[in-house]
Amino acid sequence: MMNNPMMNPMIQNYMGNNMRQMGQMDQKNIGLTRLNKEYQLCSKDMDLIQIGCNFGLENDLYHWRVTMTGPKNTPYEGGLFFISIIFPEDYPTHGPEFKFLNKIYHLNVDWKNDLGHICINSINSWRTSGKVIGRPVYTVKQALLDIFCLFFKQGVESAYDKGMADDYVNNTEKFNEEAKKWTKDFAPMN
């Protein structure tokens, strides 16, 4: 395998070892190549989102941890939010799973049944489509930008909690106060 200066060294080393053992490019190495491309895309022009790969004790390249800062003039201002991205072994055939790791008071984040699950149609359809092979139609960078947009917009139509959605529609000020409180309690910057 040729050395690629643009490739994350850990991914390149992992791929090189696997390819030497197997002598061919299998689904896992296709996924690792795509992961490297995704990482490179996410590393460019993402001032508001910090991408950090948490490789874990076992050098788990399929689990990333992302940090997002709550934007100004939103109830999430001053918050530091962590998102877990778990890529399936058959990536990119199936998309990754995105979850908030710390609590956030938001209509489109589930804290009752599936802790931290994010409901965005584009992410959910990507995860289950099984059709994303080869050139990426939807990327991790786009998914992260979609998640970042959640700080500015609540998706009432896809809210997890009807009571919370009613509060948002009928008393946005009360909703925003609760979101600020959760940000202070569960996502403090310091």
Predicted features and spans:
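Flexible, active-site-adjacent loop/turn segments at secondary-structure boundaries
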Residues: T74, E89, K103-L107
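Domain-scale recognition of soluble eukaryotic interaction modules
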Residues: M2-C42, G95-N190
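N-terminal onset of structured domains
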Residues: M22-K28, L32, N36-L80
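Proline-anchored loop/turn motifs at beta-strand termini and strand-loop-strand connectors
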Residues: I86-G95
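Alpha-helix initiation and capping sites
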Residues: T74-G79, Y91-P92, K141
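Hydrophobic residues in beta-strands and at strand termini
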Residues: M68-G70, F87, F100
